[in-house]
Amino acid sequence: MTQRKNMYSKKNSFGRSDFPEGFLFGTASSAYQYEGARNEAPRGESVWDTFVRKYPERNCYSNADQAIEFYNHYKDDIQRMKDINMDAFRFSISWPRIFPLGKKSKGVNKEGIQFYNDLIDELLANGITPLATLFHWDTPQALEDEYSGFLSEEAVDDFKDFAALCFEEFGDRVKLWVTLNEPWVYSIGGYDTGRKAPGRASKYMNEAAVAGESGLEVYTVSHNLLLAHAEAVEVFRNNPKCKDGKIGIAHCPVWFEPYDSNCPKDIEACERAMEFMFGWHMDPTVYGDYPAVMKKSIGKRLPSFTAAQSKKLRGSFDFVGVNYYSAFYVKNIDEVNHDKPNWRSDARIEWRKENNAGQTLGVRGGSEWDFLYPQGLRKFLNYAKNKYESPKFMITENGHCDIDYEKKPKLSNLMDLQRTEYHKKHLQSIQQAIQEDGVVVEGYFAWSLLDNCEWNAGYGVRYGLFYVDYNNGLKRFPKMSAMWFKEFLKREEEIEDSEEEEYVLKSTMNKKRFLLATGSSASCFIPKMSESSKALELLF
């Protein structure tokens, strides 16, 4: 055993202690994707409820009425977080669960408030720091019906009322907040390509779309989202209960590399792509205005801020949330069809999975856009640090997907070596950015604790550290990635007592790699792992 301890001593490996004191490690979720209980707990309709029911063929014939029933199982799931040594959890507060009809004046759901109070209290009782997201795409359908949601500036005041109530009810205990989750995705997907709720786009962008105007509505919606963010931050900073709290936007940058590294136009296109994707929502919160390249390209279709709005937006964040998954090559486009405007043609870019030499950026994951490129996260953090005068960052999402529409055997889903490697390499990139580059990163949230309803991709895409058996009562089972995090996150005082367990884990992973290479059966090498007090087995 002495030799084993020397070989696998935690002190000589990568772990929690390699990060700054107080660095948060957690997992992320969203209300629509997790909560479920649609038919038993009061909640108003969201645009996603309507979209998936109205257009099932555009949503893999799935909905989130049940989701993974986090509403009823959150206590057990919090024990799972605790069991793998996580110390934070990011969740979203469902706007239509709090205001079923979208407006405070039309009724507040006390049961919804109680649910989030109970969730927050349970997290804190288990030593887990809550991070709450106010808007994770679930616009109340009532507001969509009344004034077309965020296409109207009326949404700003209703969102402000929602945010104010959340700060008042939960701000004494929740000290980390995200106003908007991925405004780029919400605007592009919902109003330019029409692939996500509410599914609006021009016919030349999406034949299935029944209404919308690509290249116009996308900018209007993002503009109103930014105004709503600024109002919410002002309310937050004026509420005594939120004293010492921090707030920001969860952006979703993709890192870009030039399609042809020797082509000046492709190199320039990478910078333009970053401005159109990240700068679009970041610049207004720093400088009070959109990037110059966007204003020049889009012209009158891009709304402008008043002096008062600009002032309110500047400095409206305490940290920059980063949802990073992958990277792409970018090719410059010289000529575009101005009669068919859209975000990508305005940016004059084309995303490519391979460069001019036929190379990908890394190993492909479960989806066509999911490439393992952890150095892209480090490059992005340095890009944003240098451009925006060293803000503080929070990695609010980072994850790897498996595709499971064919219902793969449970074993192959649980032995998620590629996901384990994905998280490890991205954490290494973050650690390098902190220690070698001087980037200030304060936390990391893996997407996601559990497999869940992945929006219009349904349940066939799995991101969880825990496997959810959709055909067996939504039972949860830890994957190898959960086991890895459990070991990675052990604190120094826990290490000496766990070296034998760690040896078994590492031996199993090495044997599994060998078995994958040789095609042999893996069943005899799978270790057992107790899950909290329930003593569930990893595999059975």
Swiss-Prot record:
Domain of life: Eukaryota
Record family assignment: Belongs to the glycosyl hydrolase 1 family.
Database matches in InterPro entries: Glyco_hydro_1, Glyco_hydro_1_N_CS, Glycoside_hydrolase_SF
Keywords, alphabetical: Glycosidase, Hydrolase
Name of the top EC class for this enzyme: hydrolase
EC numbers on record: 3.2.1.21
Active site: E182 (proton donor), E397 (nucleophile)
Keyword Hydrolase (UniProt): yes
Catalytic activity: Hydrolysis of terminal, non-reducing beta-D-glucosyl residues with release of beta-D-glucose
Signal peptide: none
Repressor among keywords: no
Protein's organism: Arabidopsis thaliana (Mouse-ear cress)
Official protein name in the record: Beta-glucosidase 27
Molecular function GO labels: beta-glucosidase activity
Amino acids binding a beta-D-glucoside: Q33, H136, N181, E182, Y325, E397, W447, E454, W455, Y463
One of the protein's GO biological processes: carbohydrate metabolic process
